[in-house]
């Protein structure tokens, strides 16, 4: 797991990625248009509204975001994942430039020793439970997700990864929780302090992932839906940016705010998790970028961007290139963008598509006939 400590920021250059899980561009923009205050808060950023993710789920999206390297079932996924997190060329470059790398999330667990030297905030956890009754309740829910009558299934839904968060760390340090509320509460309580040296932070938050908990003010409510969770994600993001501004480290930070993939929401915002995914609908994430010392009104670009382009843009941003100039593609350019699709938990069989048009247009997302199956 990774320890909580989102507070140190350096007076040198920082590189900060805030990943809001499962925020879909189309739904996001509906929320954006209801909130004129967002535009002022996201000044200095360029919003890329025609961005394609590479995959429909977090596990494969995140390594692509930080490495630009596609996973095609040619090796065990864990081998690929460890290689990317430990030795991706971008991370190697940052280390050579004396960046301290930290990664905040609570989903990934690695064997002891595997990730040594990768991030400075990893904690070893013992698998002892701090709340056995809660654990038992969650196990019963998990069984219910599979065997309960259909009507009861929504009541049984919870994020199975929360089982992991019941582990104790050796010194009882609190592990980072990806829940929007936990991060938001920490932001309100803690000051960001100056430290020497260059910092890279990758912060993975729940965003608008199921189950839906939050209203726009990040209160846990019973009738939360996908849209209120997008609002809560923005509330948390804006509070974080304000903290960086207050601490005087906003200008000298490259800041990326993105989602790892979109979401295929049908009709009204539904509050039960989708388990029978459509073929498509998750390929259109959000992407905000701010370069070093940018100072301008919020701007939108329709350039046809793919997540495989991100790492190339990171290097340019660190060199001082502005956010509207960090990709080689410009608005109006035509290109085909790759998308590897698999069904939920069916990553052994990936089907290649090409997006021949606008990222959000499913009618132009065409299968190429290529598939990538696990050996």
Locate predicted features.
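Catalytic domains that recognize anionic headgroups
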Residues: 1-375
